[in-house]
A protein has these predicted regions:
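Conserved catalytic-core segment of nucleotide-activated headgroup transferases in glycan assembly
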Residues: 87-134
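A nucleotide-sugar donor-handling region in carbohydrate enzymes
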Residues: 31-93, 97-106
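Active-site and donor-binding regions of nucleotide-sugar-utilizing enzymes
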Residues: 1-59, 99, 137-140, 156-157
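Short amphipathic alpha-helical segments
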Residues: 21-23, 108-109, 161-164
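Structural motif
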Residues: 7-8, 93, 147-148
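Residues at the C-termini of beta-strands that transition into short coil/loop
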Residues: 13, 32-34, 132-134, 171, ...
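C-terminal amphipathic helix plus adjacent low-complexity
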Residues: 8, 60-62, 84, 110, ...
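Donor nucleotide-activated moiety binding/catalytic core segment of transferases
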Residues: 2, 17, 118-121, 126-178
Length: 187
């Protein structure tokens, strides 16, 4: 029953009406799972369960996704001890990461999977595997032989990059990371 939209709010996630409030306030801090070394989660029965709070979370001001802009000491990333693998040059298929229903709604991308598949087919003839957090095959297993990972805004794209799989995003804050038109010639 929040009504004072002039106040700054802090929210964890976008469910339970919090996104409706985000749209109305002038100033907010958004908290969600981090891009790296996330807390343990499990995905089942169309729900995400947080198993522990030992990992990192992200806090973003007036957006759902951090732009990456700013100057940050490199020791912050080094302290995460992320083993970044060399780029996989022999992957055979593209993982198309289906957004959750709430993200499709928030970003007004109800046909994102089909529209993105059609766009990809203009630039590649590789097999496209649609994956979401409730898929039977784990993302870790799929990434072993993936050529690329394509997502609207999933933090799984950062995991893919760390595992040597180039990631492509269509969300405006992340689109500058890679260009889908260059999917056959990744950076």
């Amino acid at each position: 029953n929040f009504k004072d939209f002039k106040k700054t709010i802090v929210t964890y996630g976008v469910l339970r009406g919090t996104f409706d409030i985000i749209k109305k306030v002038q100033n907010y801090y958004y908290i969600d799972h981090g891009y790296f070394n996330q807390s343990g989660r499990e995905f089942k029965n169309n729900r995400t369960g947080v198993l522990n709070f030992d990992g990192y979370f992200r806090i973003v001001h007036n957006n759902l996704i951090h732009s990456g802009d700013g100057n940050f000491p490199d020791d912050r990333l080094k302290n995460l001890n992320i083993n970044i693998k060399k780029q996989n040059k022999s992957g055979s298929y593209i993982i198309l990461s289906e957004p959750s229903e709430i993200m499709k709604k928030i970003y007004n991308q109800h046909n994102w999977v089909e529209e993105t598949k059609q766009k990809l087919k203009k630039f590649t003839d590789r097999k496209i595997i649609i994956h979401n957090k409730f898929s039977n095959i784990t993302l870790d297993e799929l990434l072993k032989n993936a050529w690329a990972f394509v997502s609207l805004q999933s933090t799984a794209g950062f995991k893919a990059m760390a595992m040597g799989v180039p990631s492509y995003f269509t969300e405006k804050t992340l689109i500058k990371i890679n260009n889908i038109e260059e999917i056959e010639n990744p950076k």
